[in-house]
Curated annotation (Swiss-Prot):
Subunit structure: Heterodimer of a catalytic subunit (MsrP) and a heme-binding subunit (MsrQ).
Keyword check for Acetylation: no
PANTHER family per the UniProt record, alphabetical: PROTEIN-METHIONINE-SULFOXIDE REDUCTASE, PROTEIN-METHIONINE-SULFOXIDE REDUCTASE CATALYTIC SUBUNIT MSRP
Protein encoded by which gene: msrP
Signal peptide extent: 1-44
Catalytic activities: L-methionyl-[protein] + a quinone + H2O = L-methionyl-(S)-S-oxide-[protein] + a quinol; L-methionyl-[protein] + a quinone + H2O = L-methionyl-(R)-S-oxide-[protein] + a quinol
UniProt family annotation: Belongs to the MsrP family.
Cofactor(s) in the UniProt record: Mo-molybdopterin
Organism for this UniProt entry: Paramagnetospirillum magneticum (strain ATCC 700264 / AMB-1)
A GO CC term attached to the entry: periplasmic space
Protein name (record): Protein-methionine-sulfoxide reductase catalytic subunit MsrP
Cellular compartments annotated: Periplasm
Alphabetical GO biological process terms: protein repair
A Gene Ontology molecular function term of the record: metal ion binding
Lineage per the UniProt record: Bacteria, Pseudomonadati, Pseudomonadota, Alphaproteobacteria, Rhodospirillales
Length: 308
């Protein structure tokens, strides 16, 4: 898969023409009515620049990206998040993120204070779910490493832990013991600092909808989708790795690294192929989801079967 600078892509190349024109019309009108349904402000169209990384594959239709979701906090069925968010997860402002652990500048920042110092970038990434389906999503976000550096992680900061909002009133899926809430994920510090890792605040040029992890989520395109934690409220620098949510729930099936690897099957299904949403035939899964040239060196010398 060719990964090229987004500066080499025109927006009309990335999105089918009708959708591209609809999006332009949508933003021009302010989209007040549609955004009101999601609890987002009318100005939710985002000012962005083209970031340095994008795939040249056509994106998955926006309707599929916003209605076919894994977000167990809102329900375990793919349709639950989009169906339940308008009744429960109706407000994603105000929002704050607490920074703690092995860093010189811990604290709690509001969403705007966390995001405003940075330039929002458009990045078109492949997303591979551990369930053997995939999408291509045009994200809007900020390089994760740029954000983390502001808090000056110390020499003991070997890992970064992320935590999702825990609020069963807004996230009714948390009323069931599907996993040990809140949802927790983690990365090695070098993974978190890699320029592909993204803190996303939007998709298709608009703010994230609640079912997609509003208002701020992680996107790590070379890992299975469950690593890209949604609705983040805490970031902690740590000396040791976290025992993440799915590691606690099913340690034989879900490891800490969760790198996309067609040579290492899930205990219950093959990872050698995937179903791209919107396509009939399966396609071969690529090592590191097609980002091997960028990230394989992070795992030099590691046994990727043992460190799954």
């Amino acid at each position: 898969m060719l990964i090229r600078s987004a500066a080499d892509l025109r927006e009309s190349e990335v999105t089918d023409k009708a959708l591209w024109l609809d999006r332009r019309r949508f933003l021009a009108l302010g989209a007040a009515g549609a955004l009101a349904l999601s609890g987002l402000p009318a100005e939710a169209g985002l000012n962005t620049v083209k970031g340095p990384f994008s795939t040249d594959e056509p994106p998955t239709p926006r309707k599929d990206v916003t209605t076919y979701n894994n977000f167990y906090e809102l329900g375990v069925e793919k349709s639950d998040p989009a169906q339940l968010a308008p009744s429960y997860f109706t407000k994603t402002r105000p929002w704050s993120v607490t920074i703690a652990g092995e860093c010189a500048k811990p604290g709690t920042l509001g969403y705007e204070d966390l995001i405003k110092p940075h330039r929002l970038e458009d990045r078109i990434y492949r997303m591979r779910c551990v369930e053997a389906w995939s999408m291509v999503i045009p994200w809007v976000g900020i390089p994760l490493g740029e954000v983390l550096k502001r808090f000056e992680p110390g020499s003991k900061a070997k890992f970064v832990e992320f935590t999702t909002l825990q609020d069963p009133e807004r996230l009714p899926g948390q009323r069931r013991s599907v996993i040990d809430w809140p949802y927790v994920e983690g990365l090695r510090i070098d993974e978190a600092m890699h320029p592909l890792a993204l803190l996303a605040v939007g998709l298709y040029g608009e703010e994230l909808l609640p079912q997609n992890g509003a208002p701020i989520r992680l996107v790590v395109p070379w890992k299975y989708g469950f690593k890209s934690i949604k609705s983040i409220v805490a970031i902690r620098f740590a000396e040791t790795p976290s025992r993440t949510a799915w590691m606690k729930a099913a340690p034989r099936e879900y490891g800490f690294y969760a790198n996309v690897n067609p040579a290492v099957d899930h205990p219950r299904w093959s990872q050698g192929a995937e179903r791209r949403i919107g396509e009939f035939l399966k396609r071969k899964t690529l090592p590191f989801n097609g980002y091997a040239d960028q990230v394989a060196s992070l795992y030099s010398g590691m046994d990727l079967a043992a460190n799954f």
